[in-house]
Amino acid sequence: MLQHRLLSLVAACLLGSAIATHPGVGRAQDATPAGSPTAGERSTAIVVSATNDPLRVPGSDGVDHLEYDLLVTNAFAAPVTLTSIAVTAPDGETLLHLDADALAGVTQHLLGRTPATEIPASGTVAVVMDVTVPHDRALASLSHQITYEVAPDAPVRSLIGAYAIDGPQLPVDPRPTTIIAPPLRGDGWLANSGCCAAESIHRAIRVPVAGARIGKQEIFAIDFARLRDGKPFSGDGARPEDWFGFGAEVLAVADGTVVAVTDGYPEQTPLQPITGMAKPEDFGGNSVVLEIAPGVYADYAHLQPGSITVAVGEQVTTGQVLGLLGNTGNSSGPHLHFGLIDDPDPMVGNSLPYAFDHWTLQGTFDLDAYDAAGDPDAPPALTLKETPEPQDGTLQLYLDVADLG
């Protein structure tokens, strides 16, 4: 996998996303097995909640993405299997339908991307929800219809009164997308992790916060790695200097105030086991946090030691150099981890949607093709567009390759 051979860019600064608690599971619907009770509220084997109200962002693919996770807890004495999830608009239109096969690709253990459509007794899984709608489609809320099954010989199966439930109903977060300048310049910048695919490392990060909620720390964060001729480094990539993005200038995405600076972490050795991760603060390595609006903070991680040019309390302007792209902290290959959060502490802040004012979509990257580079029949890993697509006010999505100007 590219995440191991290319960068293994496991999220660096575990940013945070607020959990909106939605008590209860709503109203039980017709049970799927013959003879099951159908009227009124019924007992169920599962309880469903959400990590956050759906957050909306315009993507480079021409549609808006609404992002959140459903948390499904099995309160039953035997394994439960999810069989379908439907998402509907207030007018009843079905916006997304996930059957059993589709659920297998988006249902995961709470931390990590391991598929987990079967929920063990007293266990919880997360379903990565990526609902897409046209840019001009107004949505106030999303509703969910969920079905599941248990084995016919499961113990105390008779306790289950319904195998289909409604809920939760989630209001769409009304906050507008923050429009910013890109944090880097030049072409060949790959979003090696980012929104909105379930297989993206960032999309799968879930870390409990304050013993009270499961945070979505990196929904919209991007790990930027630079490509040349479809590769991130020259030679064997054993030195940070071999990587094409190493040393790139990291820029302020808006006018703002420096609220946090961390320096002194050494460079990691690329493509080798990461060392020195003793506490949460170590993950970001050398980093900078800017406040760019009330309650909106820009987080930059993995910068080169000694390269940071700003200090806490300093006012910065859009495009100002903050430091140089490095390989410090939780990083197995030089890259910039960037995202917006709603708290100056990247460990607890909620991930916020953002978009770049002007950039160009050059193409897309294929992880499987990269891993099969030795196969003469494998397609090229990097597919460039015949005509690059100018983008205004959109988010660079997972595996997009961008010219950031």
Model-derived features: positions:
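Short, solvent-exposed loop/turn segments enriched in Ser/Thr/Gly
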Residues: T51-N52, G62-D69
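Asparagine-centered strand-capping/turn motif at beta-strand->loop junctions
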Residues: V72-P79, A89
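Terminal connector regions
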Residues: T132-T178
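Acidic, glycine-rich catalytic/binding loops that coordinate metals and/or anionic ligands
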Residues: D173-N192, S200-A204, A212, G235, ...
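Zn2+-dependent peptidoglycan hydrolase active-site motif and core
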Residues: F244-G245, T257-Q304
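A structural signal for short beta-strand/turn segments enriched in small hydrophobics and glycine
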Residues: G256-V258, G313-L325
